[in-house]
Swiss-Prot record:
InterPro entries: Uncharacterised_YebF, YebF/Cmi_sf, YebF/ColM_immunity. NCBIfam families: PRK13680.1 (NF010224), YebF_not_Cmi (NF041240). This is Protein YebF. The lineage of its organism: Bacteria, Pseudomonadati, Pseudomonadota, Gammaproteobacteria, Enterobacterales. Keywords: Disulfide bond, Secreted, Signal. Belongs to the YebF family.
């Protein structure tokens, strides 16, 4: 009986660690054309990209926030960047929880990385 309990405990611990690791990994994605945009334009592009492209594909985000159409926003004053490389703090609010991302956008490369924060 003790072996079974220890095995179940180990299995549960392993699953918990895997779930935590999955939720803290960054996600690299293709990003639409954004060269020459200012901070407000980049903020709008990141918000639009998340709402139209990411939330529909990232089931773990839908599950965490508790809905398929959460509210996403960016405070433009917190957007920093130069030479078409930007750091954008994104907040996603749903029924169950909030998700916070630091989105690193490289306009020249056409890529973005969503890092949980």
């Amino acid at each position: 009986m003790n072996k079974r309990g220890a095995l179940l405990s180990l299995l549960f611990l392993s699953a918990s660690v895997s779930a935590f690791a999955a939720s803290t990994e960054s996600k690299s994605v293709k990003f639409p054309q954004c060269e020459g945009l200012d901070a407000a334009g980049i903020a709008a592009s990141v918000k639009r990209d998340y709402q139209q492209n990411r939330i529909v594909r990232w089931a773990d985000d839908q599950k965490k926030v508790g809905q398929a159409d959460p509210v996403a926003w960016v405070n433009v004053q917190d957007v920093v960047g130069q030479n078409d490389k930007w750091t954008v703090p994104l907040t996603v609010r749903g029924k169950s929880a909030d998700i916070h991302y630091q989105v690193i956008v490289d306009c020249k490369a056409g890529k973005a990385e969503y890092k949980p924060r």
